[in-house]
Amino acid sequence: MLHTLSHSPWHADIEGLLRMLGDGDELLLIQDGVLAAIDGGRFIEILNNAPIKVIALKDDIDARGLAGQISTKIDVVGYTDFVKLAIKHPTQMSW
């Protein structure tokens, strides 16, 4: 399943998201969800300890001026890879 986090992690149910994770799931951070990928932040530690791959959308990172602040443990992708993820995971959950 592809999980997409589009809201600020401060306004999202991160614990609920973590409970819903399954084998092979991936988390794509989009819109304000990219705030969860800030290196040294509270949420990046939580996500790095989760048993999933975490990915962030480059355009949303750039739009928020966060390019130099994103954890190196996060894969940063463009819209083409976003589409590939959506095809790879026909089941999706938005947070």
Swiss-Prot record:
Family: Belongs to the DsrH/TusB family.
Protein role: Part of a sulfur-relay system required for 2-thiolation of 5-methylaminomethyl-2-thiouridine (mnm(5)s(2)U) at tRNA wobble positions.
SUPFAM superfamilies per the UniProt record, alphabetical: DsrEFH-like (SSF75169)
Main location: cytoplasm
Name of the protein this chain belongs to: Protein TusB
Keywords: Cytoplasm, tRNA processing
GO CC terms: sulfurtransferase complex
Annotated compartments: Cytoplasm
Protein origin, superkingdom: Bacteria
InterPro entries: DsrEFH-like, Sulphur_relay_TusB, Sulphur_relay_TusB/DsrH
Gene: tusB
GO biological processes: tRNA wobble position uridine thiolation
Pfam family, one: DsrH
Assembly and oligomerization: Heterohexamer, formed by a dimer of trimers. The hexameric TusBCD complex contains 2 copies each of TusB, TusC and TusD. The TusBCD complex interacts with TusE.
